[in-house]
Design a protein with these regions (language model features):
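Extreme N-terminal starter segment of soluble prokaryotic enzymes
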Residues: 1-5, 32
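Glycine-rich phosphate-binding P-loop
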Residues: 5-19
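N-terminal phosphate/diphosphate-binding loop that engages ATP/GTP or pyrophosphate donors
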Residues: 17-100
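Short internal beta-strands
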Residues: 35-37, 146-149, 172-180
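Switch II (G3) loop of P-loop NTPases
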Residues: 91-125
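Charged helix-capping and loop-helix junction motifs
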Residues: 120-131, 160-163, 188-194
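Inter-motif core of Ras-like GTPase G domains
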Residues: 120-151
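C-terminal lobe/tail of nucleotide-utilizing enzymes
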Residues: 163-229
C-alpha cells in the first residue's frame, strides 16, 4: 500500500480539494484508494473535509480518527474540550489495519506540516504529520508527502520552509500542488507558478482553480483531470 501524506503551507490553502483531485486521478489510473483524516476540528457531525471529498468524488472509503469541536489546532481543541488527545500509536495501528485493502492511502493533515495533532507516549511528546510520515517510512511503507500551497504573495517562503522541514527529516516529497489559484491572478500569483518549482526544486504537479469545491461530482471528476501537468 502506497501512502501519500497531503500537507499544506498553511491552513485554507486547498488541501481538501487537492486530496479530492488526487482521489479522482488515482481512480482514473485504476487504483483502489482510501482517504484518512487523523483529526478534524471545528465541524459538526456530518460535515468536514471527508464529507467534502465524498461530495466531490463519490468515494466511500473514508476514515476519520478523531473530531474536536473548536476550529483550532487538534491538540489545543482537544485540551479545551477536556477530552483525550489523539493517540499516535492508535493512528498508526489504524493505518496498518488498512494494509491489503487498498493500493493507495491518502492522509490529509490539519493546517501545516508541524501542527500538533495529538500525543505520543513513547517518547512522550506531541506529534505532527511529519512524525507520522517518519514512522510509516521507518516501517517500510512506500511513503511520500505532497505540499499544497497558495500562489499569493509570500507563498515562496512558506513553501521553501515546508520543503526544508521535510528534507531535514529525510522525508520524501513528490512535489507541490497550487491550491485555489485565482481566476484573475495578479502578478505574484502568475510568477509564483514558475517560481515555486524553481525555489523548491520540486515539480508543480497541479494547479487547482479557486471555487473548485463548489462543483458537482460529475463536474469535479471531469475538470480535475485537466489540472495535473
Amino acid at each position: 500500500m502506497k501512502i501519500t501524506l497531503v500537507t499544506g503551507t498553511n491552513t485554507d490553502v486547498g488541501k481538501t480539494i487537492a486530496t479530492a483531485a488526487l482521489v479522482v486521478r488515482l481512480q482514473e489510473q485504476g487504483k483502489s484508494v482510501a482517504v484518512m483524516k487523523p483529526a478534524q476540528t471545528g465541524e459538526p457531525e456530518g460535515s468536514g473535509d471527508l464529507a467534502t471529498i465524498h461530495k466531490l468524488t463519490g468515494l466511500d472509503h473514508l476514515y476519520e480518527c478523531a473530531r474536536f469541536p473548536e476550529p483550532l489546532a487538534p491538540d489545543v481543541s482537544a485540551q479545551r474540550a477536556g477530552v483525550s488527545l489523539l493517540d499516535f500509536d492508535d493512528v498508526v495501528e489504524r493505518i496498518v489495519g488498512l494494509e491489503g485493502k487498498y493500493e493507495h492511502l491518502l492522509i490529509e493533515g490539519a493546517g501545516g506540516l508541524l501542527v500538533r495533532l495529538g500525543a505520543q507516549q513513547q517518547p512522550k511528546r506531541l506529534w505532527t504529520l511529519a512524525d507520522l510520515g517518519a514512522e510509516l517510512h521507518s516501517r517500510g511503507y512506500d511513503t511520500e508527502f505532497l505540499i499544497v500551497t497558495s500562489t499569493n504573495l509570500g507563498s515562496l517562503n512558506s513553501a521553501e520552509l515546508t520543503v526544508e522541514a521535510l528534507r531535514h527529516r529525510d522525508l520524501p516529497c513528490a512535489g507541490l500542488i497550487a491550491g485555489s489559484h485565482p481566476t484573475h491572478a495578479g502578478l505574484a500569483e502568475q510568477l509564483n507558478l514558475t517560481d515555486l518549482p524553481r525555489v523548491t526544486d520540486l515539480p508543480l504537479l497541479a494547479v487547482i482553480p479557486e471555487g473548485s469545491g463548489k462543483l458537482s461530482t460529475a463536474e469535479f471528476r471531469h475538470a480535475s483531470q485537466q489540472w495535473f501537468s
